Amino acid sequence: MSQKELWYETLHANFGQYFSVENVLYREKTEHQDLVIFENPELGRVMALDGVVQTTERDEFIYHEMMTHVPLLAHGQAKKVLIIGGGDGAMLREVSRHKNIEQITMVEIDAGVVEFCRQYLPNHSAGAYDDPRFKLVIDDGVNFVNQTTEKFDVIISDCTDPIGPGESLFTSVFYEGCARSLNEGGIFVAQNGVCFLQQDEAVNSHNKLSHYFSDVSFYQAAIPTYYGGIMTFAWATQNPALRQLDLATLQNRFAQAGLACRYYNPAIHVGSFALPQYLLDALTTIPKVIGVDSSE
């Protein structure tokens, strides 16, 4: 029996995971990132950037449903949505399922990601790039939110881990720009890593976001591909009531939206905001910082 090729993730120095590779479909080092897509017998097509798995066909729906339907249904009346990152198109796919949304803007730093994902991960976008409400902007996310005069109801930061090009999307200057770019009652969400292994990410995000939003918290979802299992998402708004909607309200909005999901449902929505005690403890011991260094 021939030995299978193995691909090793390099996110963590002392532990990690590997994937068997049936076929490498695409590999290219662009100006910004080292991109690879390969096929795995259990997870389907896998995309990795700079040695870190970003998405797989098998479980991407969990991540994308929770990053979109939680803020959109909590808001209830979103018309304009901004996606930072999301070049694989799956975030756009889920947002576009909400027919009440009038405009979807996506800012992606790397045009190469969009191009090769449309070809090699077509199920992620599922035709959403052709939605007439969609506008693609090739730009740095930090630059966009600090230069635009547009306002949005929901901003979704589909960022990579805070290394390389994704690092700037965890800074105070980015969070400040997002807060300024939201309409009244707007919601900001962002991926914040696997908290059990990357707790500092959540603590740092909470500390910085709290300077610009009066209600900052997190919600979670179980996503097998991401080593450690439980992915944490940052949540920030000026209206704490949006995080505390009752189940009946969410069930009504979910029914009106006509959504059929594979992971998200209103009960999952409510339960996702229940955080483990170790995270609550870490957040309550954050030292108070006087002043904000926008370069951090």
Curated annotation (Swiss-Prot):
Q: In which pathway does it act?
A: Amine and polyamine biosynthesis; spermidine biosynthesis; spermidine from putrescine: step 1/1
The record's listing under InterPro entries reads: PABS, PABS_CS, SAM-dependent_MTases_sf, Spermi_synthase, Spermidine_synt_N, Spermidine_synt_N_sf
Tell whether Cell inner membrane is among the UniProt keywords. no
Q: Which GO terms describe its molecular function?
A: spermidine synthase activity
Tell me which family the UniProt entry assigns to this protein: Belongs to the spermidine/spermine synthase family.
- Function, as annotated: Catalyzes the irreversible transfer of a propylamine group from the amino donor S-adenosylmethioninamine (decarboxy-AdoMet) to putrescine (1,4-diaminobutane) to yield spermidine.
Query: What's this protein's name?
Result: Polyamine aminopropyltransferase
Subunit field text? Homodimer or homotetramer.
Q: Which PROSITE patterns match?
A: PABS_1, PABS_2
Q: Where does S-methyl-5'-thioadenosine bind?
A: 33, 108, 140-141, 165
* Annotated spermidine binding sites: 64, 88, 158-161
Task: Give GO cellular component annotations, separated by semicolons.
Answer: cytosol
Which coarse location class describes where this protein primarily resides? cytoplasm
Organism, by scientific name, is Yersinia pseudotuberculosis serotype O:1b (strain IP 31758)
Record keywords:
Cytoplasm, Polyamine biosynthesis, Spermidine biosynthesis, Transferase
Q: One of this protein's Pfam families, by short name?
A: Spermine_synt_N
Active-site residues, as the UniProt record annotates them: 158 (proton acceptor)
EC number of the protein: 2.5.1.16
User: Where is the PABS domain positioned along the sequence?
Assistant: 5-238
Keyword Amino-acid biosynthesis in the entry? The reply is no
Under catalytic activity, the entry for this protein gives: S-adenosyl 3-(methylsulfanyl)propylamine + putrescine = S-methyl-5'-thioadenosine + spermidine + H(+)
Which NCBIfam families does the record cross-reference, listed alphabetically?
MFS_SpdSyn, PRK00811.1, speE
Q: Where in the cell is it found?
A: Cytoplasm
The processes (GO biological process) annotated in the record are: spermidine biosynthetic process
